[in-house]
């Protein structure tokens, strides 16, 4: 079969468990609603038309045709009045006849739009992690995100299901069903499981491409399924590791399907796409070198923060306050990681009313993790590109890392001043580490334009908690 003798490849019994519409399901359960039968949407900043849809129940998606990650203005109704939006409907090519309008307005009235509660989602996630640990040791569990994770059940199958008449495939299915049952009984949340008696990659592909559409919400893809199932994935972007940009690059090479990728020349792929091309070739053939205990980790490309502002920022001083705060927040993360940056980048997105492209710019710098120096670089980049206009989103990113011990001091540097700043910076970081980011704030944090205090109450940019740099 193909290039590989799969009998020589590593074999593990993997379950990849995904919580169905996790945030929305948690909100439904907390309100005594059935997660699959209620129309509910978790929306950040629902008080304005740019509210971000973070999650939605399956019924919400079915009725309004919206998946996760969208905007309030993408919905066919006004979130405040719950009336049909003819403007949005026409823009999206939706019908506007009276029956459809009535259908949307009736469901809009019955739909719950709720703010995110990240602390609640984390608490439920911890409960689910404890369920996982009933079936495998902590070393056998790899959380992939807050709502999904891998469990290596290789050493657990025979312990929980000693029946020798059953195949490992059957045992994996039985044990995965028990995990689903326990999650539902203890949290009220439904889960989907991708399984594989081969490796984590095939378990992930089974989840994304089959398990979500089966009555049991489980599916198993192993080595014997590569040609029939993996090669038959209809959209290349449904394959792990292929986004729109990579898809275009593959198309340029004359590759338009997973089968064509799997049967292409690996040397040519490596020449055109580097190691990423070679890795995709292996994956298209069902080969995955990672495992749950030592998962593949991509090289860190950078550290950054970005945010959508609650209103349009027009005044230059207000925009500078935001950029200063973000430069400092990312600098804190940089020092925590024991690194210095050699490349500073910023992103500035304009308001919808501004007909102009976003600003993307960067500059190479001498290795540093000094807040004051990095802030100066960020502001310099901004002033070099910005002339005028209302701003609605900003981002700051540091990359090109070197070890913290690396440093270059020129004859023109004030060494005493640099050492003094470093000691002060270390002291500030230590205080914030122990007492929280807001224990020490600059005076401009009290200004109306500042976002430091507001974002200190967030987790992952949403309600409850804080950013890494805003502990």
Task: Show where each model-derived region lies.
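Short histidine-centered catalytic/ligand-binding loop motif
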Residues: 117, 161-169, 308-316, 362-369, ...
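Glycine-/small-residue-rich active-site loops that bind phosphorylated ligands and cofactors
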Residues: 120, 370, 403
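Core structural elements
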Residues: 146-149, 340-354, 397-406
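Gly/Gly-Pro- and Ser/Thr-rich, intrinsically disordered tail segments characteristic of DNA damage-repair
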Residues: 1-279, 418-471
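DNA-contacting surface of Y-family translesion DNA polymerases
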Residues: 3, 7-9, 16, 61-62, ...
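C-terminal hydrophobic structural anchor segments
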Residues: 379-434
């Amino acid at each position: 079969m193909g290039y590989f003798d799969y009998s020589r490849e590593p074999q593990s019994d993997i379950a990849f468990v995904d919580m169905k519409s996790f945030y929305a399901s948690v909100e439904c359960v907390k309100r005594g609603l059935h997660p699959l039968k209620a129309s509910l949407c978790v929306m950040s900043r629902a008080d304005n038309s740019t509210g971000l849809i973070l999650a939605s129940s399956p019924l919400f998606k079915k009725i309004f045709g919206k998946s996760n990650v969208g905007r309030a203005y993408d919905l066919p109704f006004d979130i405040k009045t719950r009336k049909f939006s003819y403007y949005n409907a026409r823009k999206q090519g939706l019908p506007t006849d009276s029956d459809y309008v009535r259908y949307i307005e009736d469901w809009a009235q019955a739909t719950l739009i709720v703010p995110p509660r990240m602390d609640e989602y984390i608490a439920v996630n911890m409960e689910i992690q404890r369920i996982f640990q009933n079936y495998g040791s902590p070393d056998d569990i790899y959380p992939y995100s807050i709502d999904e994770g891998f469990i290596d059940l290789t050493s657990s199958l025979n312990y929980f299901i000693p029946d020798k008449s059953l195949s490992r495939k059957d045992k994996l299915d039985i044990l995965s069903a028990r995990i689903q049952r326990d999650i539902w009984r203890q949290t009220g949340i439904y889960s989907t499981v991708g399984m594989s008696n081969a490796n984590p990659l095939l378990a992930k592909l089974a989840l994304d491409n089959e398990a979500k559409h089966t009555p049991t919400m489980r599916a198993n893809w192993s080595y014997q399924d590569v040609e029939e199932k993996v090669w038959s994935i209809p959209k290349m972007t449904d394959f792990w590791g292929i986004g729109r940009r990579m898809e275009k690059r593959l198309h340029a090479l004359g590759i338009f399907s997973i089968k064509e990728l799997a049967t292409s020349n690996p040397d040519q792929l490596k020449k055109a796409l580097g190691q990423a091309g070679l890795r995709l070739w292996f994956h298209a053939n069902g080969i995955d070198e990672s495992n749950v205990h030592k998962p593949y980790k991509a090289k860190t490309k950078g550290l950054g923060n970005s945010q959508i502002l609650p209103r349009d920022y027009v005044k230059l001083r207000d925009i500078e306050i935001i950029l200063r705060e973000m430069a400092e927040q990312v600098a804190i993360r940089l020092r925590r990681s024991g690194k210095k940056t050699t490349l500073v980048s910023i992103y500035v997105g304009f308001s919808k009313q501004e007909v102009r492209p976003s600003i993307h710019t960067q500059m190479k710098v001498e290795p540093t993790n000094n807040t004051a120096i990095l802030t100066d670089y960020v502001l310099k980049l901004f002033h070099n590109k910005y002339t005028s206009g209302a701003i609605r989103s900003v981002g700051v990113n540091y990359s090109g890392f070197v070890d913290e011990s690396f440093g270059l001091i020129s004859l023109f540097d004030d060494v005493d001043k640099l050492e003094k700043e470093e000691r002060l910076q270390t002291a500030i970081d230590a205080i914030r580490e122990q007492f929280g980011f807001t224990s020490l704030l600059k005076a401009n944090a009290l200004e109306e334009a500042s976002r430091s205090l507001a974002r200190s109450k967030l987790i992952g940019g949403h309600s409850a908690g804080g950013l890494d740099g805003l502990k």
